[in-house]
Amino acid sequence: MYDYIKGTVTTITPEYIVVEAGQIGYQIITGNPFSFQRLEGTEAQVFLYQHVREDNISLFGFQTTEERYLFKKLLSVSGIGPKSALAIIASGDVVPLISAIESEDDVYLTKFPSVGKKTARQIILDLKGKLADVVASEIVYVAPENDMVAGLSPQLEEAVLALEALGYSTRELKKVIPKLAKEADLTSDAYIKLALQLMTK
């Protein structure tokens, strides 16, 4: 099983990129190959998922471990294959996706290729409440000097900083922090789940 590849991006096509490492060119399927265009001709690190079938072995590539974990979560949903999962996260912005799942917004989910209403409902059924832990564990951040988290418990502070790293604004977070602070003794994951629920109401 491969975790990542580090090499030179030599080729970019509408469906895949080629990364050369150790004088071998690896064809890697990505959601948006052209997002690697700025890296063409330079060394890049691409996180990998190896998909094995009887007649084919494919490598799927991601720019972050967060994208890869979401891809794997989507693969666990009945009716979602690798190509569909890749298309869902191809936009590169996972915040609306997570928010749609948490708020049961099947209309938003049906905008993705190969996702009808039945599949959208299945995604919500299988993944609602199960993505916050992935987000919390996969986002790497450095805690800044931030007045917004002053005086909060370590668990709530970690949750707020993770949500901030996801792209939620200070204004959005300040609205929910007082409500979160009333809930004592929650884990960071639980605070994130609760915050997502509050912000999508």
UniProtKB/Swiss-Prot annotation:
One of its GO terms (biological process) is SOS response. NCBIfam families: ruvA. Has three domains with a flexible linker between the domains II and III and assumes an 'L' shape. Domain III is highly mobile and contacts RuvB. Its main location: cytoplasm. Belongs to the RuvA family. The RuvA-RuvB-RuvC complex processes Holliday junction (HJ) DNA during genetic recombination and DNA repair, while the RuvA-RuvB complex plays an important role in the rescue of blocked DNA replication forks via replication fork reversal (RFR). RuvA specifically binds to HJ cruciform DNA, conferring on it an open structure. The RuvB hexamer acts as an ATP-dependent pump, pulling dsDNA into and through the RuvAB complex. HJ branch migration allows RuvC to scan DNA until it finds its consensus sequence, where it cleaves and resolves the cruciform DNA. Disulfide bonds: none annotated. One of its GO terms (cellular component) is Holliday junction resolvase complex. Residues 153-201 are annotated as: Domain III. Homotetramer. Forms an RuvA(8)-RuvB(12)-Holliday junction (HJ) complex. HJ DNA is sandwiched between 2 RuvA tetramers; dsDNA enters through RuvA and exits via RuvB. An RuvB hexamer assembles on each DNA strand where it exits the tetramer. Each RuvB hexamer is contacted by two RuvA subunits (via domain III) on 2 adjacent RuvB subunits; this complex drives branch migration. In the full resolvosome a probable DNA-RuvA(4)-RuvB(12)-RuvC(2) complex forms which resolves the HJ. InterPro entries: DNA_helicase_Holl-junc_RuvA_I (IPR013849), Hlx-hairpin-Hlx_DNA-bd_motif (IPR003583), NA-bd_OB-fold (IPR012340), RuvA (IPR000085), RuvA_2-like (IPR010994), RuvA_C (IPR011114), RuvA_C_sf (IPR036267). It is found in: Cytoplasm. The lineage of its organism: Bacteria, Bacillati, Bacillota, Bacilli, Bacillales. Pfam families: HHH_5, RuvA_C, RuvA_N. Residues 64-142 are annotated as: Domain II. One of its GO terms (molecular function) is ATP binding. This is Holliday junction branch migration complex subunit RuvA. Keywords: Cytoplasm, DNA damage, DNA recombination, DNA repair, DNA-binding. Residues 1-63 are annotated as: Domain I. Residues 143-153 are annotated as: Flexible linker.
